[in-house]
Amino acid sequence: MESLGIGFSNLVNSNRIIAIVSPETNPIKRIVQKAKEDNNLIDVTFGRKTRSVIIMDSSHVVLSCLQPETLQMRLDKSNNKED
């Protein structure tokens, strides 16, 4: 299992990530609201501002306080270690 650090010592399986997006757009806000209603929302911001939304292949939506660019760099670094 390849894991991605998403802040505050929390990890997700990087092989199951579909998208890492910014939370500001209305479609993403609707996805987050739907996940909350369906009990599929995982909030690991620890009260800080949500800066990225991670959509998983298991229909879970993960909120992180890290920028999408930061998560992308961590994911790229993790993928380069495999090579």
Swiss-Prot record:
The highest taxon in the source lineage is: Bacteria
Segments forming a coiled coil: none
Q: Which Pfam families match?
A: RemA-like (PF04025)
Which family is this sequence assigned to?
Answer: Belongs to the RemA family.
PANTHER family the record matches: REGULATORY PROTEIN SSL2874-RELATED, REGULATORY PROTEIN TM_1690-RELATED
Report the protein name in the record: Putative regulatory protein FMG_0656
Q: Which organism is it from?
A: Finegoldia magna (strain ATCC 29328 / DSM 20472 / WAL 2508)
